[in-house]
Amino acid sequence: MPQENNTFYITTPIYYPSGKLHIGHAYTTVAGDAMARYKRLKGFDVRYLTGTDEHGQKIQQKAEQENITPQEYVDRAAADIQKLWKQLEISNDDFIRTTEKRHKVVIEKVFQKLLDNGDIYLDEYEGWYSIPDETFYTETQLVDIERNEKGEVIGGKSPDSGHPVELIKEESYFFRMGKYADRLLKYYEENPTFIQPESRKNEMINNFIKPGLEDLAVSRTTFDWGVKVPENPKHVVYVWIDALFNYLTALGYDTENDELYQKYWPADVHLVGKEIVRFHTIYWPIMLMALDLPLPKQVFAHGWLLMKDGKMSKSKGNVVDPVTLIERYGLDELRYYLLREVPFGSDGVFTPEGFVERINYDLANDLGNLLNRTVAMINKYFDGQIGSYKGAVTEFDHTLTSVAEETVKAYEKAMENMEFSVALSTLWQLISRTNKYIDETAPWVLAKDPAKEEELRSVMYHLAESLRISAVLLQPFLTKTPEKMFEQLGITDESLKAWDSITAFGQLKDTKVQKGEPLFPRLEAEEEIAYIKGKMQGSAPAKEETKEEEPQEVDRLPEITIDQFMDVELRVAEVIEAEPVKKADRLLKLQLDLGFEKRQVVSGIAKHYTPEELVGKKLVCVTNLKPVKLRGELSQGMILAGEADGVLKVVSIDQSLPKGTRIK
């Protein structure tokens, strides 16, 4: 049972509704839902928040393009998002919209408080601005920098997304970020689990705090779609304050009705994508410090759900619509895949092949067949009746009982750390062990010997109880399947579906099983893989006809022997961090994970890739080159790339190959 304070407040980012949501957005929200359901199962009083970030220049421009008002645009978009959450059976307790009055009135108060405290001041700002990112950048932060004949910067791209930036000069209010830098570092030290995974914390400290925090622009005057600054209404409160404070405004903070704030704040965990870690672990805690408010207990930054060819985009024809998958395959199938396939703190790759395999092997074969066989045997041998637990009869019984009890402990540990894929993998070990138990005990042989009836009855009980425990553990992840399992096992007593009922083996008693429909019909793999690929390609714009390329003459190098080639050590390396090298427009500093060790490599690809495009990619690295220093940075190898028409492309590799694999 939970501790004395049994509340649990969990949030997702609020989504920016400038385009249709894809499976990557569903990933975050389903993960948050699984955690919320798990905590409810454990007896916690849970508050799960999600919502939409509805202000900003991009929204205003989108509305103008459609000849509608920004409010009409966001009303439609928010309705679509809420419809998707309903289809995913997200159990959120609230949906906050930043255009709601309850949000705007508090934002006005917060801004005024920060102004009165001297944390915000008015000045003029000139900087490079990316509209899609709604972010200002300094010259040193830009990538793909363009210069004129005098060497002056005349353009570049966002280091976060690769979008072009434009030089903007305007009056702005600024937040004194540097004032709180030391206090923030101290908080990191005193709260080592505040930022998870650990690698994200190191990135924040080394890349942003140690180099020095610059004051942050927190208002805009070049558009008017947003919350106005009360004493200076030509200014609109910028996204950093407007969006981040949703976690408080949804609880009624600084209003007469602040019961929810008093009950649930500080948040137990903010779930965010890794691209917005900085805003949640630097800007957000500093603003809370300025208001003398408690900080959230944890920010968990998960990775991206990628495709084989990188991030999802319509231009690549690799966008996956979650609704398409739900309608054809079912909701539980999608939810299971999302949380089983990818370690939550890392990037993962969606493949149609992997999706279909998870359904056929894990769900249909392992789980579905186990339930079908168990119910059929209990019906056949004991007219569907399950009695009470008599204890283990054989060593096989003892082993299965032990595995079940250890599974519950390991599952609980994984869930507390938000290791969803580990929790499901642990549960599937119990399911696999239960399948093996059938082969070990051979009930069909026991049934032929009347003297073995007690042993046979014990086998049937252990099968049913293992399935009941599995159904309880599935409840955070799957919304329909656990109830179908309880129904087929004849379980109507709600106490047998609760967490407390699985801490010790043997709680099931006096039920009658009933045959039901198969949980997961098996799919025709090739047909379904082709279907999903077709839907993905359908997301791409029509391609123009291309002329067939003529063969080109190339300069050939002298031939080498196989022994000479084998002297070059090529290995699969995953990019875990990437950043520009200071005062070097062409260089990126990459942190590579080789599986057996981590290395730093400096590569001359900064004009062709943003850091974010590389993080999560598996590349080919030459690992036995002598280390060198480039612009003062140690480089312990080289990544392979090819050049065509002046454009460099890194050599990527099948994402399923393990890190460190030798390439021959």
UniProtKB/Swiss-Prot annotation:
Region (Disordered): 536-556
Motif 'KMSKS' region, chain ranges: 311-315
Enzyme Commission number(s) of this protein: 6.1.1.10
Catalytic activities: tRNA(Met) + L-methionine + ATP = L-methionyl-tRNA(Met) + AMP + diphosphate
Any single GO BP term: methionyl-tRNA aminoacylation
Subcellular location: Cytoplasm
Span(s) of short sequence motif 'HIGH' region: 15-25
NCBIfam families xref list: metG, metG_C_term, PRK12267.1
Record-given protein name: Methionine--tRNA ligase
Lineage of producing organism: Bacteria, Bacillati, Bacillota, Bacilli, Bacillales
